[in-house]
């Protein structure tokens, strides 16, 4: 699928992937255009992109790759390896991109990759997710993680959020239906990033020392940073710091 997108700036190629239920506008405060050709996309089932099964992570990563390939073929963007930056579920898609396709670097913003804990939480909420209380669950979940955002920015992000039940259920199908062993095998495949591809994790919600050790085993070159204040949105709490850090990491 060719995704809805916008392109701005000039320089090396950098791609921004939003989180689940959001769209590319979530990146509005984060300006990389002084130093990069920036491509922002709406992932499948989000924003202006088509809502069409399947919604598995490898398919979402392939959509991004196909969109970039078409843009490069049409000389809209430079034909070079991209820096892929993903927030939340977009961080998993960015990671999968690095496992499936050549990339210059991967940046994962506040998305743990060891999904066993998330699987338990999602399965406990399965009734709400599949029922009429779906919007209530989604808004409540993100409200708990929005620390650090001022009232204006929180209202902006919430105004972008557009939960589609079929899309969320499709993206979370492995969490709802796979065994723990099947989920672990899926994650193992998605984290097979070549060791010469730099991998940066910026998180506002500390997943703890056991997770940090697990990630170092899965992606040995990973650089992990925990920013304050505690939040799911470190890139929106301090966009200038985020841009500066990513620029320094990939230069």
UniProtKB/Swiss-Prot annotation:
GO MF term list: acyl-L-homoserine-lactone lactonohydrolase activity; monoacylglycerol lipase activity
Pfam families for this protein: Abhydrolase_6
Top-level taxon of origin: Bacteria
Biological process annotations from GO: acylglycerol catabolic process
Reaction equation(s) it catalyzes: an N-acyl-L-homoserine lactone + H2O = an N-acyl-L-homoserine + H(+)
pH-activity dependence text: Optimum pH is 8.0. Little or no activity below pH 4.2.
Taxonomic path: Bacteria, Bacillati, Actinomycetota, Actinomycetes, Micrococcales
Primary gene name: aiiM
GO CC terms: membrane
Species for this entry: Microbacterium testaceum (strain StLB037)
UniProt key word Lyase: no
Cited function: Hydrolyzes short- and long-chain N-acyl homoserine lactones with or without 3-oxo substitution at C3. Has slight activity towards L-homoserine lactone, and no activity towards gamma-butyrolactone.
Name listed for the protein in its UniProt record: N-acyl homoserine lactonase
EC annotation from Swiss-Prot or TrEMBL: 3.1.1.81
InterPro entries linked: AB_hydrolase_1, AB_hydrolase_fold, AB_hydrolase_sf
Keyword annotations: Hydrolase
Thermal behaviour (record text): Retains over 80% of maximum activity at 15 to 60 degrees Celsius. Activity is greatly reduced over 70 degrees Celsius.
Entry keyword annotation includes Hydrolase: yes
């Amino acid at each position: 699928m060719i995704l809805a997108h916008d392109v701005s700036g000039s320089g090396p190629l950098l791609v921004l992937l939003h989180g689940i239920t959001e769209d590319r506008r979530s990146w509005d405060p984060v300006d990389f255009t002084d130093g990069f050709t920036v491509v922002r996309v709406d992932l499948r089932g989000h924003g202006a992109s088509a809502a069409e099964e399947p919604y598995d992570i490898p398919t979402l990563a392939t959509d991004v790759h196909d969109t970039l390939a078409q843009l490069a073929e049409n000389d809209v963007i430079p034909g070079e390896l991209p820096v892929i930056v993903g927030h939340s579920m977009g961080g998993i898609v960015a990671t999968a991109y690095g496992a499936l396709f050549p990339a210059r670097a991967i940046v994962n913003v506040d998305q743990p990759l060891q999904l066993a804990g998330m699987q338990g939480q999602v399965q406990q909420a399965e009734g709400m997710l599949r029922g009429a209380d779906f919007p209530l669950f989604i808004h409540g979940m993100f409200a708990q993680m929005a620390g650090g955002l001022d009232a204006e920015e929180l209202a902006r992000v919430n105004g972008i959020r557009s939960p589609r039940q079929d899309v969320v259920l499709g993206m979370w199908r492995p969490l709802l239906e796979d065994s723990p062993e099947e989920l672990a095998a899926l994650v193992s495949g998605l984290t097979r990033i070549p060791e010469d591809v730099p991998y940066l994790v910026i998180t506002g919600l500390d997943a703890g020392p056991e997770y940090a050790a697990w990630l170092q085993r899965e992606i040995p070159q990973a650089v992990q940073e925990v920013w304050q204040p505690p939040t799911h949105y470190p890139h929106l709490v301090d966009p200038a710091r985020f841009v500066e850090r990513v620029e320094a990491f990939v230069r």
